[in-house]
């Protein structure tokens, strides 16, 4: 329909599905409390799937007048200067624009007091819902009474409190790195684990250490080092791990920035990546393949997380039941993890 006879319309969608145009309108553009009651679950699903397929875009001004919604979504992230966060936000903005929505984004710097203050500020903008990308595992900031009655979803990070989230399968990603190191014969391995309050760090670490434990090679506690998700934190943690005579032969850094910091520490100590030390990161940011020693990394679907978070939020706004979604990771092997140094453990 799109590209053949002009913009996709509610009437055109209704005709394709054999429904009354008012039913389609209520499902796609009705007030949030009524969308879930406008049609049966199966009919609403068919309407939304066809609207997605055809690229239907509501008129935000007309919809706002009709529904008394602001068509504004609040977005909270730790800091947009980080490439992973920026890429996720690109997905959020792309999908929101496609759905006739605008976004209002703010940084919280992973500080609980700032999180609470920014949540209040964003809610003051009369947003229809929130996408929260800075959640801590304990979910403390999300217990703010100000959020009562406001639909929200999490992206990139989950909580232990069960809020709906769109994330990468971080445990599986960590497990993939462990299997790669095991295949190369590495028995003495360490993890630069990121911040303990973030599910991204804890889940990736757990996936890695669980796989080594299954292989009969549990990691000593001092070979799991927490640090900031940045190059400076990775450099400090790696320097501590690599400075003594009892050092690991392989390191898994739970994000690429910490892995790049590890590269700097290895350089300072005269260690050759891929020879004296195997290294892997996580997220497969664009820089990973272009480094002097290309970085083995777990590719996570960053922009797709953002797009799916918008879709999940819209279902919550419509009053539909939703469940968390985990997207599959992919290990991309490059020179930094080197060659086989011994037989895999039996």
Map each language-model feature to its residues.
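Short acidic capping loops at alpha-helix termini that bridge into adjacent secondary structure
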Residues: 187-189, 219-223, 272-278
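Flexible loop/turn connectors
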Residues: 239-346
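Alpha-helical recognition/docking segments in bacterial nutrient-uptake
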Residues: 1-5, 67-179, 183, 197, ...
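Periplasmic-binding protein-like
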Residues: 126-134, 190-193, 224, 245-255, ...
């Amino acid at each position: 329909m799109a590209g053949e006879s002009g913009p996709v319309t509610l009437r055109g969608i209704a005709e394709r599905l054999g429904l009354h145009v008012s039913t389609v309108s209520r499902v796609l553009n009705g007030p949030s409390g009524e969308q879930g009651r406008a049609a049966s679950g199966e009919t609403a699903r068919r309407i939304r799937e066809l609207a997605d397929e055809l690229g239907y875009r509501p008129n935000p001004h007309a919809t706002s007048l009709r529904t008394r919604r602001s068509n504004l979504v609040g977005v909270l992230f730790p800091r947009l200067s980080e490439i992973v966060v920026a890429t996720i936000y690109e997905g959020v903005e792309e999908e929101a624009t496609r759905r006739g929505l605008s976004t209002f984004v703010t940084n919280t710097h992973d500080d609980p007091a700032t999180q609470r203050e920014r949540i209040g500020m964003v809610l003051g903008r009369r947003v229809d819902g929130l996408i929260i990308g800075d959640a801590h595992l304990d979910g403390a900031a999300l217990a703010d009474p100000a959020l009562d009655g406001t639909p929200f979803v999490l992206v990139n990070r989950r909580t232990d409190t069960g809020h709906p989230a769109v994330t990468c399968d971080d445990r599986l990603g960590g497990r993939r790195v462990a299997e790669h190191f095991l295949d190369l014969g590495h028995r003495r391995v360490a993890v630069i684990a990121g911040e303990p309050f973030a599910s991204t760090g804890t889940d990736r670490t757990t996936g890695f250490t669980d796989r080594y434990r299954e292989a009969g090679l549990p990691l000593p506690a001092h070979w799991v080092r927490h640090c900031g998700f940045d190059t400076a934190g990775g450099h400090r943690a790696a320097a501590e791990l690599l400075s003594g005579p009892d050092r690991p032969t392989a390191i898994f850094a739970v994000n690429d920035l910490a892995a790049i910091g590890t590269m700097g520490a290895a350089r300072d100590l005269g260690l050759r990546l891929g020879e004296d030390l195997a290294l892997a990161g996580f997220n497969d940011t664009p820089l990973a393949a272009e480094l002097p020693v290309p970085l083995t990394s777990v590719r996570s679907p960053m922009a797709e997380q953002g797009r799916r978070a918008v879709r999940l939020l819209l279902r919550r706004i419509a009053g539909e039941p939703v469940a968390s979604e985990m997207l599959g990771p992919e290990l991309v092997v490059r020179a930094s993890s080197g060659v086989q140094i011994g037989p895999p453990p039996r």
